[in-house]
């Protein structure tokens, strides 16, 4: 039986101070680290965003749908289970708290995961996920051999570049030599303006909202085959009803 661990799949960067030139041009990793690692007042104590999310809570309008919306969490779990069989390897990029990933472990999927933030990795590992700290752009060609499905919830909003858009991200995916038939499951909040293809977050620097139509067309342009493209509605504590872009694609 094919066996591979997240340690083999994901190489931990030697330093978070010295990232590759390409990655620096796409994502401000220090900005990401500060946003998630800074403690904020929550109830009677201080907590990081991850600690707040772990309790199913919100910091102002900041939530993760996989803990704040049980319907969303259930939908994503069912979607990924429908795309894989028991024992299949699912690879989560930017696993965060790892709630959907933990549910998939309980459903007898083998879940490997990476996240740039050590705290996220620790929380995911507590849920049985084989998670390690790593940078997506540092993965080596062939690192995801044997993976049947790739899942990224909210990651694309961090990787979107105002000029390069998602081209470097999808080029990196293709460099990993994914097996034909591998499914890609991407999820990200869409812009509030239904006419906008993408839009910068007005509260979180460096994060972008991505529409269903944009993501579908960008994946198609990158050479992937679209299986599903739709919106999943859910509510946030302040902004209210929001649409979550969901797109399922196949590696040809």
UniProtKB/Swiss-Prot annotation:
Which Gene3D superfamilies does the protein's record reference? Vaccinia Virus protein VP39
Q: What does this protein do?
A: May play a role in tabtoxin biosynthesis.
Superkingdom assignment: Bacteria
UniProt organism field: Pseudomonas amygdali pv. tabaci
Segment Disordered: which positions? 1-23
Disulfide pairings:
none
* Protein name listed in UniProt: Tabtoxin biosynthesis enzyme
InterPro entries from the UniProt entry: SAM-dependent_MTases_sf
């Amino acid at each position: 039986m094919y066996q591979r661990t997240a340690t083999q799949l994901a190489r931990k960067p030697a330093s978070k101070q010295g990232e590759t030139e390409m990655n620096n041009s796409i994502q401000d990793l220090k900005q990401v680290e500060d946003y998630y690692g800074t403690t904020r007042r929550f109830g009677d104590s201080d907590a990081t965003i991850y600690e707040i999310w772990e309790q199913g809570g919100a910091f102002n309008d900041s939530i993760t749908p996989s803990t704040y919306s049980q319907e969303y969490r259930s939908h994503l779990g069912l979607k990924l289970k429908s795309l894989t069989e028991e024992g299949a390897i699912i690879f989560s990029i930017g696993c965060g708290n790892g709630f959907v990933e933990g549910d998939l472990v309980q459903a007898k999927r083998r879940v490997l995961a990476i996240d740039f933030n050590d705290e996220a990795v620790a929380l995911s590992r507590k849920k049985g996920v084989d998670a390690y700290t790593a940078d997506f752009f540092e993965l080596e060609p062939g690192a995801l051999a044997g993976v049947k499905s790739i899942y990224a919830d909210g990651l694309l909003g961090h990787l979107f570049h105002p000029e390069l858009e998602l081209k470097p991200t999808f080029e990196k995916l293709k460099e990993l030599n994914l097996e034909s038939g591998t499914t890609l499951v991407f999820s990200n909040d869409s812009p509030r303006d239904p006419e906008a293809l993408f839009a910068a977050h007005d509260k979180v620097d460096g994060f972008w909202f991505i529409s269903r139509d944009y993501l579908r067309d960008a994946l198609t342009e990158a050479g992937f085959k679209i299986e599903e493209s739709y919106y999943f509605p859910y509510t946030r504590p302040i902004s209210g009803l929001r649409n979550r872009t969901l797109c399922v694609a196949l590696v040809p």
